[in-house]
Swiss-Prot record:
Name this polypeptide is given: Protein CfxQ homolog
Highest taxon of source: Eukaryota
GO cellular component: chloroplast
UniProt keyword annotation of Transcription regulation present: no
Designated gene of the protein: cfxQ
Species the sequence originates in: Cyanidium caldarium
């Protein structure tokens, strides 16, 4: 008996998901390569099953590390789709949660909360953002450890029904795993999301504007790149998320600039164009 790799690959339609990932995310080549590697492993494992070869279910739980706004949630959504198309999960949906969704504030509250989240996520992927906040060793009365114990049981006993992705800053996630070796041993796939370069963030910003039918003037584009370079040096920078916030404020200033001269006849160009002054009025340039 033989199986045709190309036929199997086409039937799963995972190439469409990988193409979407390439198109929707600027840069992140190492991340995209890692996702392709995981997809290849899962496809080959599926072929082994078809030929009756021994196939221990590959560890599917994952760790996504990196700063906010680097595409972790987007990639998690695509990963859920890949797992679904390959038959590793039954539904393919993604549930995103944080500590507050899992941990209660009093005795007996955490277990029901965590179990309800897990019930909702069954058949799909559970994405736990800033997972390290589940563990607070400095507080003996914290109930996060109870949530972790329940997660460990499900990761081991129901791994055919649910994939869990733990996400957050790399340094904090490393400490989280070091403090929870039982958890670390169950997470087979680690994917690191690097910060974007200023040029990549400019490209992301231009795409965001195009999606909303806006555009930069050439001067505004240069100024926005300068803005990004300055903003990256400031606290709480969140990559693409910070770019989106900056563009929202630029649109607000553009609207106020137009509104300040009510007598003029406006063209489509006037309404879609972000000028350099719409960016230069932000605090970073003052």
């Amino acid at each position: 008996m033989k199986v045709n790799l190309q036929t199997e690959f086409k039937q799963t339609q995972i190439q469409q998901v990988l193409d979407d990932l390439d198109r929707e995310l600027i840069g992140l080549q190492a991340v995209k390569t890692r996702i392709r590697e995981i997809a290849a492993l899962l496809l080959v494992d599926r072929l082994r099953q078809k030929l009756g070869l021994s196939s221990s279910n590959p560890g599917l739980h994952m760790s996504f590390t990196g700063s906010p706004g680097t595409g972790k949630t987007t990639v998690a959504t695509k990963m859920a789709d890949i797992l679904y198309r390959l038959g590793y999960i039954k539904k393919g949906h993604l549930i995103t949660v944080t500590r507050d969704d899992l941990v209660g504030q009093y005795i007996g509250h955490t277990a029901p909360k965590t179990k309800q989240v897990l019930k909702n996520a069954m058949g799909g992927v559970l994405f736990i953002d800033e997972a390290y906040y589940l563990y607070r060793p400095d507080n003996e009365r914290d109930y996060g450890a109870e949530a972790i114990e329940i997660l460990l049981q499900v990761m081991e006993n129901q791994r055919d029904d649910l994939v869990i992705i733990f996400a957050g800053y790399k340094e904090k996630m490393d400490r989280f795993y070091a403090s929870n070796p039982g958890l670390s041993s169950r997470v087979a796939n680690h994917v690191n999301f690097p910060d974007y370069t200023p040029e990549e963030l400019l490209m992301i910003g231009k795409i965001m504007l195009q999606e909303q039918q806006y555009q930069f003037t050439p001067e505004a584009e240069e100024v926005f790149l300068q803005y990004i370079q300055r903003r990256m040096q400031q606290p709480h920078f969140a990559n693409a998320r910070s770019v989106r916030n900056a563009l929202d404020r630029a649109r607000l200033r553009q609207a106020n600039r137009i509104f300040a001269t009510p007598g003029q006849n406006l063209t489509k160009y006037d309404l879609v164009t972000i000028q350099a002054e719409d960016i230069l009025k932000c605090r970073l340039f003052q």
